[in-house]
């Protein structure tokens, strides 16, 4: 598996429920190789978040990243943010738990 972990900050003037609703809408997209996205809101700062996106492999991750459809989704996502996300792409080397395989 392959994916990314992104750190980002939502603008303070953004309605958090509206942000969550828009992110949930992205879940209806049909994206080859896409497994899941998880978004965490930190306890320490309610405007700071982490996104974990999981794909079958690097090729499907890269195909999505290069797609026009993903670029449209990114622009909507970016409109909620203070600045550009910090992206950390990589290979998943371990996954544990009942739903991890």
Regions found by a protein language model. Name each.
Residues 2, 8-11, 36-47, 75-101:
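Glycine-rich beta-strand-turn "strand-cap" elements at beta-sheet edges
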Residues 7-9, 52-54:
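Short hydrophobic/aromatic beta-strand micro-patches
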Residues 9-20:
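Short, surface-exposed ligand-recognition loops at beta-strand->loop->(often short) alpha-helix junctions
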Residues 14-16, 59-61, 95:
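Residue-level signal for secondary-structure boundary sites
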Residues 25-36, 54-88:
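An amphipathic, aromatic/His-enriched active-site/gating alpha helix that lines ligand/cofactor pockets
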